[in-house]
């Protein structure tokens, strides 16, 4: 095994039956304890003083570990601020029979240094040795920005959520109440539960929270739920040996194959216990999946809120899901394998038809969730196997045939879409298929991105009234990647234009997101930007007041 890098702390654990659930899988609570321990020791290695967990970013679990396998956790400080540090944590699992290693999770937490007495702490900067160290150091500032604006973003989304309650509750046939999912449990903090400086161990609190949350989720599906992710949370206050910790859990909402469970933790010393006066020290939100006997994911029933508190928790889960969606692509940094196809003029007809069919299949998928609505615009998202798709629906006061002509000419796209700097025709393949080279604006001080795409348009069939404009990236030898740009990819995108009457239509824009395109949308999806709504409004304005340059009559 390679030696740990300077500043890195490594924990290796053989998974024993005592660490596992009834299914023989590593308990998520046990893993959270190990993660927190390793992160704390990495923080203290850098700070040289005792440290406590301040907050934990979203934790996504990509793989399940089982009895007999070995878990390896690596933690190191990515960036030190004045008194706090960001710790990156990487968790791997190895099968001892095959030697195969798989990624379980990449997570980030924040630790605060505890000064001795009244001494002020000013942490030394992190020594950056590799290119990856520099990347993580820069991303740490972005992640910190997201953490600091989390509360304001959440409150703004909660205010917005009431605008589309009708859209949500109109379709609640077969919905269920969450009252039967309420769970309460109590723990007495003993010396083995405390860390080496007297406070209740943060990882132990997380493990106890996970236990009650799992029970709550199981009462909704009557199956064995497994933890998929933990929402970002911060520790509100400390507890110590002798405290009684009361954990209360309840299902907040469901999203197709996911269920969110909220857990509240209150701490009581002896006097507070007698008086019934607790301290709220933590709230966390855990997201579960559940599988049937054939290991297929179960679709959870929709939730029907009844009380005022039910509605608050229901809306809160929707807001958190939206924030989580955007934050996921800031906090994680996944590379992807390009899916572009090579353009072959001899296969032009089949490539164009598959382009159109892919868009129609994306539009027909089930499980789209409303995330935003404003005046003439609705935004939906769909997550499948950690791949995100977006659907933007616009009501336009313009004939469908005119909208089709305007939107199918991509040279006009920069007039209304700020994500397009330029769009030039490479080749007119046919009357209904064109190849374009697109350039995009600079984002996050990086080089600008560019794209080579096939745009295929189709008029409605005789018995239909929907126009189609489909887009996907292709590889074209005549336009190779340029060092001036980062070559990016559109997997599947485009417009479906549905006529309402002779003077109005619904324009639906779909995009099956690639990692290279996501940064332009992450802020909007996360709730701290309005770029999608602003672009949609600009599109409506463009379609209702088209440029008078002879384009409409000649195209």
UniProtKB/Swiss-Prot annotation:
Pfam families found in the cross-reference section: 4HBT (PF03061), START (PF01852)
Catalytic activity: acetyl-CoA + H2O = acetate + CoA + H(+); butanoyl-CoA + H2O = butanoate + CoA + H(+); hexanoyl-CoA + H2O = hexanoate + CoA + H(+)
Record flagged with keyword Lipid metabolism: yes
Family matches, as InterPro entries: Cytosol_ACT, HOTDOG_ACOT, HotDog_dom_sf, START-like_dom_sf, START_lipid-bd_dom, Thioestr_dom
Activity regulation text: Inhibited by ADP. Active in the presence of ATP. Cold labile, it dissociates into inactive monomers at low temperature.
Functional pathway: Lipid metabolism; fatty acid metabolism
GO biological process: acetyl-CoA metabolic process; acyl-CoA metabolic process; fatty acid metabolic process
Residues modified to N6-succinyllysine: 33, 159, 228
GO cellular component: cytoplasm; cytosol; intercellular bridge; nucleoplasm
Complex formation: Homodimer or homotetramer.
PANTHER family (alphabetical): ACETYL-COENZYME A THIOESTERASE, ACYL COENZYME A THIOESTER HYDROLASE
Function in brief: Catalyzes the hydrolysis of acyl-CoAs into free fatty acids and coenzyme A (CoASH), regulating their respective intracellular levels. Preferentially hydrolyzes acetyl-CoA.
Protein name: Acetyl-coenzyme A thioesterase
Species this chain originates from: Homo sapiens
Gene transcribed to yield this protein: ACOT12
